[in-house]
Amino acid sequence: MNSIYEKLTTCLASVREKTDFVPETAIVLGSGLGDYAEQIKIETTIDYKDIKGFPTSTVPGHKGRFVFGYVDSVPVVIMQGRVHYYEGYPITDVVLPTRLMGMMGAKKLILTNAAGGLNTDFNPGDFMLISDHIATAIPSPLIGANIDELGERFPDMSEVYSRRMREIVKEKADKLGIKLREGVYVQLTGPQYETPAEVRMCKILGGDAVGMSTACEALAARHMGLEVCGISCITNLAAGLSDKKLNHKEVQETADRVAKQFTELITAVV
């Protein structure tokens, strides 16, 4: 058995020792957005540290647990905190939680993140619906022997982010009166914030927002056949686009400011 898949089955067995909950939708909460998990009807929670072989997040604002429950009548599993490539994990560990949620039964994945705005029309506090991504700065989670149990060797990526789900998000945002941007997300490695020169490069490539997560998870999810939706909370303007120095505290403060709108939007979309 492929060692990566073996690790996944070990993690799944560990989860199943604690709950037999089968989610329909999986949700990953980004920096500063983790409180959404407290708003649902919670059935049970599992700390990452209690799952054998599971990587744990070291980032402030990431609690590090799965929350199982219901948004209205929809069964969901929520990642309250994610692991990042910059924490030193191999990329296969970074996407292990995504794959695990798919193996739990999830058919849809909603990815959220805190991101820097590259598009000068964007403002801190805006939400950006991800239409596509650029992930060439990070290794693909599909490198290595293909895990046939998960998906095919050469998966199509012409529509990573579901057009159907994007239309739903737009419709719900419009009904809620939430201003929604749309654009291309660029994933860089971090943990350092981008230099002004890197920001210029990302803009030339066609990026509208930049961050340190999400794209690799979307790739792994699409490989498994999950329907993917991505939403960025623009928490700051990228380096060189304003006079402010970038810091994680600002990211969390901006996310806190728009938390109510975020909760309304995600609940409506689910």
Model region roles, listed by residue range:
Residues M1-M157:
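Metabolite-binding pocket within alpha/beta catalytic cores that recognizes anionic/polar moieties
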Residues S14, K18, R164, I168-I178, ...:
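Generic non-transmembrane alpha-helical segments
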Residues G102-G105, K203, R222:
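Non-catalytic positions within long, well-ordered alpha-helices that form the structural scaffold/packing
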Residues K107-K108, D208, E227:
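Short acidic/polar active-site loop segments enriched in Thr and Asp
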Residues K172-D208, I266:
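Active-site/ligand-binding-proximal alpha/beta "capping" segment
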Residues M212-E250:
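Zn-dependent metallopeptidase/amidohydrolase metal-coordination segment
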Residues A239-V270:
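His/Asp/Glu-rich mid-to-C-terminal helical/loop segments that flank catalytic regions of hydrolases
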